[in-house]
Every structure is written in structure tokens, then in C-alpha cells.
């Protein structure tokens, strides 16, 4: 698992104003930083293979600051440690966390039009014969979200950050055409902006949006909004005034520059009616970053989810983040992007002066194959996870999803109701997609257990908490259901609530260092460690009961562990044996 090369470091104890670090092998180099400034030698000691670090007195001036530790041995670099401080003490109580603590977020992704209809007075479906109901407006709005916050829906689930789809003005007429089912498409989703600073009246008024944010914050919930900077709809008055702001729809060799996402990454159009903006032009960057900042100035948002991040020039991200950081009130903002590509491409946008994180689709795709398909191999997921940790850091702010509005529902893939080898969009347009085999609920729970316990920011896509089925767009965007669940759906919802509660209340699962413990074709196990507290996670993709034997790292014994999901386990010294049911998982904690 370690290939004999990994140097792992982890925190083993804390005493308010100091903490200890243990190493799996002797390092020959140490780097210790507080707020990205190297700590003086007087604040740490190295003795008998153990590092003791003192909290600097200056930390008392900041409610939240961080110490980072990294080591190396014979050219092999360790995992990085992130130690949060609460003023001049090591953070050691959940009650010291705030909603501005980015590592402590659990996101909930919702599509406004498909979430909850709280005000039928603003319902304005196109009601056209050439637009099927599945791709027309269905009435979800700001009032619906407000109602669900007030009802306790999000707090009961354990969510502390809501990600809403775009709220800017979109066209009132349908666009595109599907030849198979004979339909055009409304802009119910919000991703075809006409004007990036005009509110979409389908969702509510400016006052109602202010109310939504006030109610969310009163309930200790962040709200981040989806912002589309890559393109404008061809009917945009901005493009009519500045046609030169768009990239060419024709490539140099005469082909249509449409959906050439990798070949012409920075210039390709998403559709013939969605011109891509030329961000290499300074005036375009200024205008679109000003438009993004407008939403922060007018409304009290807590960050952005950025659409199509990899298709936008790096200079745009640097300019936007520079403008945001000029205002101290926005230091807490969380920016997460959407990029499909290699870890190196994704990482190029995740750095100082750009984005906090991006959604890690590579780990998600691997998890879908492993937990959802018979031919999956857990070792591939283990490799992809370690690659991501090495690429983005062991305390990254990447997004780890249960699904999203551009993917077929995992539960239907795992249940065999839809195949990844077919056109998953077409599947949902020509037949009714169900859950399929009922074991798919267990497989979805295992995937969600994995995503909610690894480092990063977990994200639940609306409906995945109870297991709504569906193919790809638009079938994966069915109207949200809040009651009338069947027994399997209720049981699944209870599991997800418990998993989210563990994530929200366990410092090892929020800030813990991570070490792999075991991996074979069917089982993966790892440990999260924070100041001597541990969480051991084991997940199985097998259709049979499996027992796994684990050896805990230095300094840990298993005699005070407790299970959370009723799996049988035994401990003897530093050894732990866990029996996992088919498609089962367990989280052991001390």
C-alpha cells in the first residue's frame, strides 16, 4: 500500500498551547509554518523521534489561524499536516468551529427550479407544445428554499453550506432541439446568462433573495451561488454591443468550434447559441469579474461555485480573487470550480490567488466504477485518492460529490437501470429509469460513506440523501421529494444523516491526518488522526460478508474503539478486525 516509500506524519497529542507529531520513519528535513511564515527554532523541539510544537503568542490576535508541518526523508516528502488554532490554543472542541471554517463544510447542491416551489405566483412555465415538461420551468424558487431552511430540513440533514444554481437572467424563449423526443429546452437551470447582473425573476425578487440569505445565516448555514463567466447567451445585450468579446465559432482549419472541450479548451463554445467570452482581453476580464463582485456587494453570499472553470483563462481567476481579497469582509469566501481533466490541469487553478478548490471528478468517476459496477477494483480508487492527496494536499478544499446535475444518478447506475455504456441522456428520455436492483441503496450508502470521510469538502446532490433514481440530464433533475419515502428511502436517509453528523462532529474527520491501512480488490480502509483521536473507515464493494484485519500505526491501540454502523469488530493491541456485510461500511472511533 505504501510501496515502502511513504513517510507519514500525524498528530498524537495536544496540550492547549502545544501539540506533538509522530513519524512512521525518521525524517531528515522539517518545515513548520504558522500563517505561511516559518516558525523559529525556539518554538519546536525534536527529541526521540517526536516533534513538539508550541503555538506562537501572536496567534492570540486571530480567532482562526493555522500551523502547517511537512517532512522529508531521503527525498520522499510526507503528507502535510494542518493544525487549526482557536486564538492561541490548538482547536480541540467542535463548538469552536464556525460556518466560515471551510474544512468543516458539508455542501448541499440544489437546482433552484427543481428544489421547492414556495411561491406559485412567480410560476411562469413556457407552456409550449415544443417544450416537454421535463425541460420546462417547474416552479422552484427562493421562497421554497426559505421554507425548507425554516422547517429545519437542512439542519436536520446536517448541511451547513448550500450551493445554488445560477440566479442571473436567462432567455425567456427555448433553445436547442432534441430530434429523438422532439423538444426544445427552456433555461430553467440558469446556465445560459443573458445579463450576468440582473436577477432571474423566475426565482423571486431581490428582497426575497436577501431574506433567503438572512434566514440561512440565522440558521448557521452558508450559501454559495453558481456564477457563469465562460459564456453569455447569444441574445445578451452585452454581446450585441460588444460582438468582439466572443471567441470565434470557427477553428483555424474551418471546423465549427463547438464542444471541442479539450482541443480548444479556452475558446470552444458549449453550443451554437452560447458564445464563449475571450478572457484574454482585459476589458472582458474586467467586466466579468466586476459582475461577479456585484453579487457579493449587493448580497451577502459566502462564495462561488464557478461553472466551466477550465475553459476560462487563468488571468481571469487571478483578477477575480484579487478583487475579492481587497475587501476584508470577504476573507471567508469559498471558491470552488468545475474542471474535468487531469490532476495537473485541475491543480493549475487551485493555488494562492485563484480558487480554493475544484470538484474532484477523477475520484468520483473511480468511486462510481468501484462501488457501482461489478468489474470495479478498489485498488484503483485507492490509487486515485492518493494521487489527489499528493496533487492537492492532504487537507485540501476539493469537492467530493455523491453526484451532480450533469451525471446519471449513481443509484440507477449501481442498480443496473441505466448503463454507462449507453447514451445516459437518451436513456432518460425514452424510458422510465428506476432504482433497479435494491442493493443499489447499499452501494450508494457506501459511496457516500467514502466521500463523507475522506479529506476535502463533501457534497450531497439533492435527492441523493434518500436515493432518487434517474438517468442523465434532465432525468437527474427531477423535482425534489420531501416526504412519502418508501422504507428503503427512509433507511437510506437515516444512514446519510448519521454519516453527515459524524463528519460534522468529529475533528478527526474534519482536520484529521489520513493514512491508508488496507486495500484489496473489494475493501479499502484508512485512518483519520487528530491529536490522538482517531476514526477508522472501512468500505466494501463485495456482495459477500468480508472480514478485514487492520494494523494501527504507531502509538495507537484499538481497545477503546466504538462502532457506528453495527459491524462486528475485535481488537487486540494495535490490531483491529472488522466484519463488513455485503456493500457495507463502518466508522470506528475512540
What kind of feature is each model-predicted range?
Residues 122-140, 414-435:
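A solvent-exposed, charged loop/short amphipathic helix patch at secondary-structure junctions
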Residues 106-108, 162-164, 223-225, 304, ...:
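Hydrophobic faces of well-ordered beta-strands that scaffold small-molecule active sites
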Residues 1-19, 25-108, 117, 138, ...:
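Carbohydrate-interacting/catalytic domains
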Residues 132-136, 278, 305-308, 431-441, ...:
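Active-site rim elements
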Residues 101, 105, 115-299, 319-329, ...:
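Substrate-binding/active-site clefts of carbohydrate-active enzymes
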Residues 383-425:
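Aromatic-lined glycan-binding groove of carbohydrate-active enzymes
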Residues 113-117, 168-170, 229-230, 302, ...:
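Short, solvent-exposed loop/turn segments at secondary-structure junctions
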Residues 231, 291-293, 297-302, 308-401, ...:
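Active-site-proximal helices and loops of the catalytic beta/alpha 8
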Amino acid at each position: 500500500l505504501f510501496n515502502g516509500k511513504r513517510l507519514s506524519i500525524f498528530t498524537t497529542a495536544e496540550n492547549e498551547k502545544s501539540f506533538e507529531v509522530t513519524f512512521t520513519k525518521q525524517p531528515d528535513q522539517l518545515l513548520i509554518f504558522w500563517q505561511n511564515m516559518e516558525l523559529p527554532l525556539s518554538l519546536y523541539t525534536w527529541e526521540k523521534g517526536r516533534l513538539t510544537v508550541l503555538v506562537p503568542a501572536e496567534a492570540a490576535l486571530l480567532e482562526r489561524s493555522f500551523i502547517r508541518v511537512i517532512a522529508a526523508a531521503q527525498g520522499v516528502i510526507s503528507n502535510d499536516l494542518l493544525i487549526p488554532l482557536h486564538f492561541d490554543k490548538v482547536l480541540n472542541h467542535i463548538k469552536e468551529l464556525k460556518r466560515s471554517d471551510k474544512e468543516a463544510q458539508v455542501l448541499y447542491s440544489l437546482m433552484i427550479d427543481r428544489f421547492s416551489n414556495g411561491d406559485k405566483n412567480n410560476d411562469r412555465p413556457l407552456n409550449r407544445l415544443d417544450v416537454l415538461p421535463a425541460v420546462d420551468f417547474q416552479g422552484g424558487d427562493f421562497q421554497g428554499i426559505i421554507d425548507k431552511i425554516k422547517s429545519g430540513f437542512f439542519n436536520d440533514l446536517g448541511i451547513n453550506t448550500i450551493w445554488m444554481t445560477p440566479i442571473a437572467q436567462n432567455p425567456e424563449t427555448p433553445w436547442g432541439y432534441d430530434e429523438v423526443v422532439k423538444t426544445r429546452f427552456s433555461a430553467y437551470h440558469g446556465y445560459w446568462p443573458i445579463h450576468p447582473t440582473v436577477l432571474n425573476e423566475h426565482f423571486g425578487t431581490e428582497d426575497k433573495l436577501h431574506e433567503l440569505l438572512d434566514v440561512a445565516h440565522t440558521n448557521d448555514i452558508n450559501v454559495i451561488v453558481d456564477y457563469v463567466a465562460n459564456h453569455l447567451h447569444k441574445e445578451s445585450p452585452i454581446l450585441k454591443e460588444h460582438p468582439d468579446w466572443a471567441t470565434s465559432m470557427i477553428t483555424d482549419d474551418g471546423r465549427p468550434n463547438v464542444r471541442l472541450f479539450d482541443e480548444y479548451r479556452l475558446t470552444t463554445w458549449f453550443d451554437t447559441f452560447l458564445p464563449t467570452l475571450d478572457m484574454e482581453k482585459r476589458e472582458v476580464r474586467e467586466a466579468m469579474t466586476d459582475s461577479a463582485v456585484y453579487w457579493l456587494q449587493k448580497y451577502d453570499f459566502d462564495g462561488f461555485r464557478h461553472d466551466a472553470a477550465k475553459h476560462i483563462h487563468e488571468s481571469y481567476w487571478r483578477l477575480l480573487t484579487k478583487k475579492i481579497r481587497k475587501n476584508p469582509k470577504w476573507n471567508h469566501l469559498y471558491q470552488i470550480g468545475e474542471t474535468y481533466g487531469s490532476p495537473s490541469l485541475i491543480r493549475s487553478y487551485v493555488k494562492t490567488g485563484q480558487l480554493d478548490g475544484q470538484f474532484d471528478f477523477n475520484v468520483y468517476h473511480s468511486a462510481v466504477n468501484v462501488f457501482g459496477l461489478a468489474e470495479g477494483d478498489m485498488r484503483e480508487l485507492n490509487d486515485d485518492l492518493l494521487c489527489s492527496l499528493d496533487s492537492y494536499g492532504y487537507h485540501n478544499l476539493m469537492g467530493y460529490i455523491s453526484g451532480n446535475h450533469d451525471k446519471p444518478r449513481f443509484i440507477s447506475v449501481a442498480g443496473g437501470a441505466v448503463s454507462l455504456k449507453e447514451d445516459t441522456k437518451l436513456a432518460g428520455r425514452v424510458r422510465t429509469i428506476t432504482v433497479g436492483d435494491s442493493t443499489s441503496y447499499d452501494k450508494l450508502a457506501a459511496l457516500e460513506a467514502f466521500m463523507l470521510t475522506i479529506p476535502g469538502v463533501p457534497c450531497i446532490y439533492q435527492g441523493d440523501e434518500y436515493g432518487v433514481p434517474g438517468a442523465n440530464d434532465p432525468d437527474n433533475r427531477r423535482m425534489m421529494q420531501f416526504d412519502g419515502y418508501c422504507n428503503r428511502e427512509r433507511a437510506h436517509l437515516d444512514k446519510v444523516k448519521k454519516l453527515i453528523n459524524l463528519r460534522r462532529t468529529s475533528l478527526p474527520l474534519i482536520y484529521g491526518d489520513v493514512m491508508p491501512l488496507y486495500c484489496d480488490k473489494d475493501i479499502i480502509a484508512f485512518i483519520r488522526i487528530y491529536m490522538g483521536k482517531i476514526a477508522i473507515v472501512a468500505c466494501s464493494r463485495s456482495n459477500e460478508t468480508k472480514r478485514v484485519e487492520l494494523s494501527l500505526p504507531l502509538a495507537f491501540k484499538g481497545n477503546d474503539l466504538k462502532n457506528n454502523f453495527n459491524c462486528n469488530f475485535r481488537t487486540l493491541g494495535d490490531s483491529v478486525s472488522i466484519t463488513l456485510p455485503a456493500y457495507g461500511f463502518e466508522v470506528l472511533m475512540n
